[in-house]
Every structure is written in structure tokens, then in C-alpha cells.
Amino acid sequence: VGDWSSLAEGARAVRFEVFVQEQQIPLALEQDSADADALHVLIRNRQHLPMATGRLLQASPGVGQIGRLAVRRERRGGGLGKVALKALMAAAAQRGDREVMLHAQTSAQSFYTAQGF
């Protein structure tokens, strides 16, 4: 978990592949200024290649918002999404957030429900 300046390169690579290339979300919608102020998680494989990412925004005082959670297709189903989500939840708790909201696609609802949301 870290800031955008330290994790941007890897996070951008995963998000571009998942959101822009795979899901056809326009790059202009995927990228926003909120990244600069968010906490980010980046999970790399043994070869140090980025495999999963997500971010935690401060929605309001004491309220975090998790979003942009993405796992490369070849690593889905292996638990990386769960690891990334838990890392962001831990960062929210450490920051003192009393509540955490999700900003996610409805197609991922079953994943988040299985994680307690």
C-alpha cells in the first residue's frame, strides 16, 4: 500500500489492461485526478510484474471509498482481489475510517458480497 507517486506505473498498467483494453472503458473516464490523493495497493508476482491493484479514497471525514480494484485476467480466481481488498480495508482502518463504501461495477457484486459487503 502506498501513494500514487510510488505505485502509479504498475497500477496504470493493470488498470489499462483490465478497464480500457478488456472492458472498453474510455481512457478519459478511467483516469482521474483522485489518484493523486488516494492510497493505492499494488500486488506483483515473483517476476515483479504488476498483477492487481485498487485504491482507497477519502469520501468524507471518517468514510473511505474503495474503487478501481482490478486483477489481470490470467490471475483472476487466485485470491489476489481478496488480498488487495483486505489491504485497502486495513489501510482504511489504520487511517481511522469508521465506514468504507465501494465504487464498483455491478458485475463484481458476487465478489464483494463474498467479502462481507
Task: Cite the ranges covered by each PLM segment.
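Conserved acetyl-CoA-binding loop of GNAT-fold acetyltransferases
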Residues: 113-117
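Short amphipathic alpha-helix that is part of the acyltransferase structural core
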Residues: 1-40, 44-49
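Structured catalytic cores of enzymes that bind and process phosphorylated ligands/cofactors
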Residues: 50, 71-72, 80, 100
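Conserved acetyl-CoA-binding loop-helix of GNAT-fold acetyltransferases
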Residues: 71, 77-90
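Short alpha-helical functional segments enriched in proximate histidine and acidic residues
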Residues: 18, 91, 111
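Conserved beta-strand in the GNAT
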Residues: 42, 49-58, 62-70
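Conserved GNAT acetyl-CoA-binding A-motif
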Residues: 85, 92-105
